[in-house]
Amino acid sequence: MIISAASDYRAAAEARLPPFLFHYMDGGAYAEHTLRRNVSDLADIALRQRVLRNMSDLSLSTELFGETLAMPVALAPVGLTGMYARRGEVQAARAAAARGIPFTLSTVSVCPIEEVAPAIDRPMWFQLYVLKDRGFMRNALERAKAAGVTTLVFTVDMPTPGARYRDAHSGMSGPNAPLRRMLQAMTHPRWAWDVGLLGKPHDLGNISTYRGSPTGLQDYIGWLAANFDPSISWKDLEWIREFWTGPMVIKGILDPEDARDAVRFGADGIVVSNHGGRQLDGVLSSARALPAIADAVKGELKILADSGIRSGLDVVRMLALGADAVLLGRAFVYALAAGGQAGVENLLTLIEREMRVAMILTGTHSVAEISGDALSRVTREAAVVP
């Protein structure tokens, strides 16, 4: 298969993975309207082409939370990444480090913090949910500190799990799910050998370390459902701000008022995100939500965005809408499933090249120059940019 874009990696991942894993990563909540709009709304954004601008001094590098990034991209926290490739979190982290960008480890990763951090030569980020088990949260924060994690990403848009109908059809959940998953693995022998057998253990490493016993895929949904806390508020995060002295980013912001609350709380950054369309179907795409949020808080904290980003062109679009950087989620998991560390490195190379082309043809010499001026007048006046 010729690989020239993230869509090619998606097709390769679907061919390699058992359906329950592919659709768990690929799917969204309910009828998946928001999932689709995340992509289509970005595609609808027209850029303003400029020519004869002498683009010989182009630079993609940027500063974020005291770190120098080769481009304004970080790998997003994605649960169960270690089920998509053998010790997948380690492979993805190495790919990110090789391309000079941060990797964010999920709370519900297969590989624990202590396995991933020593595998790379740059600090990583760590994502944490707000859970009922505050002892787990404190333990995770202590371990993150000990491992040299620099930036903490708090996901706040999961006080309850989303309803993902596709999971019931694919075998991730629903009747006879364990049997269906086993049968699917048998019909995908390459994955079964490389990941299913050689990729063990398949525990949720960060949780198993805390509980002192394996917490595998069978326990995943139940443990999370029991620990998500619908009572959380900004006040509940105050002890975390006192405990964690490094940069802290609040992930899951879609409303300008919530963004202002994040500023008042003292967050160093936010992620404009609808969880990749996996939580509440029918909410705004990140691309539609971003401009109003940028108008409200730009300059008071760093603004990151995710959901729907599939190319370097999409990265430029998000920056033009007001983001300082983006998180890349599904796209890197497609590449990881299809080609491991090399696949992720190649995807990041493609994104960098696409960014360069877009910046040259919009006349923007640096990441700092990318602004609303890079958008066409038609786009600025259209409903896609509120």
Swiss-Prot record:
Keyword entries, A-Z: Cell inner membrane, Cell membrane, Flavoprotein, FMN, Membrane, Oxidoreductase
Transmembrane segments: none
Top class in the EC scheme: oxidoreductase
Enzyme Commission number(s): 1.1.-.-
The keyword Membrane is assigned to this record: yes
Domain FMN hydroxy acid dehydrogenase intervals: 1-380
Chain positions recorded as FMN binding sites: 106, 127, 155, 251, 306-330
PROSITE patterns: FMN_HYDROXY_ACID_DH_1, FMN_HYDROXY_ACID_DH_2
Keyword Phosphoprotein attributed: no
A single MF term (Gene Ontology): FMN binding
Main location: membrane
Pfam families named among the record's database cross-references: FMN_dh (PF01070)
Cofactors required: FMN
GO cellular component: plasma membrane
Localization per Swiss-Prot or TrEMBL: Cell inner membrane
Top-level taxon of the source organism: Bacteria
InterPro entries given in the database record: Aldolase_TIM (IPR013785), Alpha-hydoxy_acid_DH_FMN (IPR012133), FMN-dep_DH (IPR000262), FMN_HAD (IPR037396), FMN_hydac_DH_AS (IPR008259), LldD (IPR020920)
GO biological process: aerobic respiration; lactate metabolic process
SUPFAM superfamilies in alphabetical order: FMN-linked oxidoreductases
Topology of the protein relative to the lipid bilayer: Peripheral membrane protein
Function statement: Catalyzes the conversion of L-lactate to pyruvate. Is coupled to the respiratory chain.
UniProt protein name: L-lactate dehydrogenase
Lineage per the UniProt record: Bacteria, Pseudomonadati, Pseudomonadota, Gammaproteobacteria, Lysobacterales
Gene that encodes it: lldD
